[in-house]
């Protein structure tokens, strides 16, 4: 879910009981479980309800970010299924504040969606096709994250600093991803989080450069914000503008006049009080929703105006009915390495976090966008056109008013604006886009507050193009995506796993990689064999000379520490290799194994993942005695 509304019923934010006996036993029997420091400790070996076939490579668990207040952030990471032209990592954050990024993982851009409360199926538009995905529950207290209840965060700079701590520690565990191109994505109130985190990353990189530190600088490439709460000064008035535009309220009507009065109060408060969350401004939305209640006691869904329900959208989307029980399942909790210190069950949105996070000092994140754009960071703002609470009218207005890189809004030159380009996807009107000076805006037709939930394939096509994914060397069935009727460069959406052409090309790619590894190790073996043959030949020659009565210098028996001795000892087990008399199987026993991966995961392993995979077999007897605790 995205932006929280005061209309949310209390049951949505209650904290349910979370297996207290199991939690206590975990702490007593396995006290180091919450202090995991290696990738193996986070490895997800199995996932209940996953589709048949090889499990996608994933890690999950907690990273400590605030030792003083027991603050831990929960993450769920998926390795990309295919590598295109470069390695990328997308960090996904949901909004709220206080709403879990498991929404994004299980209802929007993650590789799985729920068929029911215990069965997963593949998401055809998952963003993990060509990018690693890192979902993080933040700030502390959100979703599976936890902290002492009196230590929830209040300001955006606090949140950003804590997130930098998380990334520092996360990359220490998973260093193979630290050099990736990094994109930060999210929706709704994450429109406040994301620019602040981006600025904090830039400040960190600058500090490393100035101090000539050996720490790696993070390659921040772009930001993606969907239906974002970025500029309250434009978004609050857009409640009424959008309602007029969509025919929800008639201009000049009694209701229209009532809302105009509330809006004028809102604007006066924006000039004097906090700039991000203003109670008097939220009254405009609440009044509008109250007046849409019909005879069936149903009102407009504030996240999708095409729908009506009794809670005005607070129980939407419908997948929530399955997500919550799934994430409360004991086996899922174990599989995701949930710390026993997380004493309450998963809630989509935590009201305590949301109540605490009401910034009084922080400036709205829109203030940071010009500097980020001018520094070379590409930014994509996308909006589903059926969302009310963070509607596209407000987003378009903030773009029109924003000044950066010598222009205002989408100006390409003084008084000339970049044109809007029509976008069609698979023969259907998909929306339009505009671009100027590192900023891209996309309006998605027939999409809600959570556009990837409604349109997974279109949004995947959108994100691939924003990240400049090049699939020329990958293959697969290209998606039919066009701008102003002209086909775009080829990318593939949902065709990769089921594409015969792609599978054949991927298998060939793996074979070539294996052959390269084999050839390198084979060269080393060949050198050893040649040396062995030469020495062996020399010994035979000397033996024959001695046998024929020739005198010479006596050759001592090779010692165990000599090179010849080691070679002899290593091959005294019957696997003798002789020049001109060997087969490839014998060579395979000598060289390091090459790449042996399924075609759904081509990338680097974490250092100790193999150890984790072997651990259950090595410790089978001991694990039974420890009640099969998660390692």
Swiss-Prot record:
Residues 1-35 form the signal peptide. GO terms for cellular component: membrane; trans-Golgi network. It holds the Pfam family Peptidase_S10. One of its GO terms (molecular function) is serine-type carboxypeptidase activity. It is a single-pass type I membrane protein. Its main location: Golgi. Its EC number is 3.4.16.6. Residues 489-501, 619-631 have a biased composition (Polar residues). Residues 588-599 have a biased composition (Basic and acidic residues). One of its GO terms (biological process) is apoptotic process. Keywords: Apoptosis, Carboxypeptidase, Glycoprotein, Golgi apparatus, Hydrolase, Membrane, Protease, Signal, Transmembrane, Transmembrane helix. The chain crosses the membrane at residues 521-541. The keyword DNA damage does not apply. The active site is at residues 188, 387, 449. Residues 542-631 are cytoplasmic. The keyword Membrane applies. Protease with a carboxypeptidase B-like function involved in the C-terminal processing of the lysine and arginine residues from protein precursors. Promotes cell fusion and is involved in the programmed cell death. Belongs to the peptidase S10 family. This is Pheromone-processing carboxypeptidase kex1. It comes from Emericella nidulans (strain FGSC A4 / ATCC 38163 / CBS 112.46 / NRRL 194 / M139) (Aspergillus nidulans).
